[in-house]
Amino acid sequence: MFKYFVKSQDCQADMTTFIIDDHTHTQCLYYVPLVFSSTETANHVAFKAHLSQAVISPGENQRIVYDDVQLNLGGGYHAHLGGFVAPINGTYLFSVAVCSIGNHYIVLYLVKNDVMIGRVLAGDTVYNDCSSETTISELTAGDEVFVQHHSTVGDLIHVNENILNSFTGALLQAI
C-alpha cells in the first residue's frame, strides 16, 4: 500500500519526528491513503476507438463501427458491434468526433438503447470540417451506447492519417 503524508494546518494531528541532514525535525502530519480498494479498481471503465477507413454513403440509421480500438478498460466496447455495453451501473461520459471533407457533410447521433442522447454535424460547402459532441448519461449495466448515421442526411465520414474520427467513453462514477 502506498502512503502519502501531508503537512497538517492544525497540529491536532499526530506529531511525527524525522531526521534530515543530521537535524531532528518534528512536524504535525496526517496520513492520506492513495490506494483504491479492490471494488474501486474493478470499476475502471474507459474506451477509445477510431475509424480505420472512410465511411462512404452510410445508409439510413446505419450504425458507425469504430473498429480501431485504442483503449478498452473494463471490456465494455465491442468493436464488432461498434457499441459500448455498460458493465456496471454508473454515470458515464461519451464523446464522438467526426470529420468531413469540403462539399460533403454528415450528421451522427449518439444513441443509448435506441434513444438519441447527442448529435453532431460536420460539413461545409467548401472546406473540410470537424466537429464533436460530448455528453453525460446515467447507464444501467447492460445498456448500450453507439453512434448512428442520422436518417439519409450526409454522405461521407472522411479519414486520413491526420484526421481521427473517434468514439470515446468513460465511467465517471459507479452507482
Residue ranges and their predicted role:
Residues 1-175:
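Extracellular jelly-roll beta-sandwich "head" domains, especially the C-terminal globular C1q domain
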